[in-house]
């Protein structure tokens, strides 16, 4: 519940070019600052983040955080222009418009998405909980 913000850390990967290394979301009022990912030491964070036991599976070169109540609910796009990407269902096409943009990341109603570093695979997710045990910050490490 509440307002969430998203951030992406992009890194220069030489011949691979600039890639999305980390995608993060934080609760606007309680989550740790995005400096946690800007420092580039996300595997050794000082924010008391916990590595989750699941892998974030990627098979389309993109991953994101979404409000479960609205995930793949096409009604969130009713007021938006039609997506430019022409393959797949409406949700997928809108997400691809974001990940195929110059930024390779962005927000949509009830979510945030980015391209996934070097593409498909399994990636690690970390979370931070507030004093009540409610998750208020999460990020996926791609690179």
Please annotate each region the language model reported.
Residues 1-143:
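Intrinsically disordered, low-complexity acidic regions enriched in Pro/Ser/Thr
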């Amino acid at each position: 519940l509440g307002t969430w913000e998203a951030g992406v850390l992009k890194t220069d990967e030489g011949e691979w070019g600039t890639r999305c290394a980390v995608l993060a979301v934080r609760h606007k009022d309680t989550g740790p600052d995005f400096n946690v990912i800007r420092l580039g030491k996300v595997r050794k964070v000082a924010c008391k983040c916990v590595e989750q036991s699941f892998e974030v599976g990627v098979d389309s070169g993109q991953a994101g955080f979404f409000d479960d109540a609205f995930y793949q609910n096409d009604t969130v796009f009713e007021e938006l222009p039609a997506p430019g990407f022409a393959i797949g269902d409406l949700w997928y096409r809108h997400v691809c418009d974001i990940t195929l943009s110059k930024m390779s990341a962005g927000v949509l109603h009830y979510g945030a998405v980015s391209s996934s570093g070097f593409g498909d695979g399994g990636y690690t997710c970390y979370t931070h909980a507030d004093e009540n045990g409610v998750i208020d910050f999460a990020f996926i490490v791609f690179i």
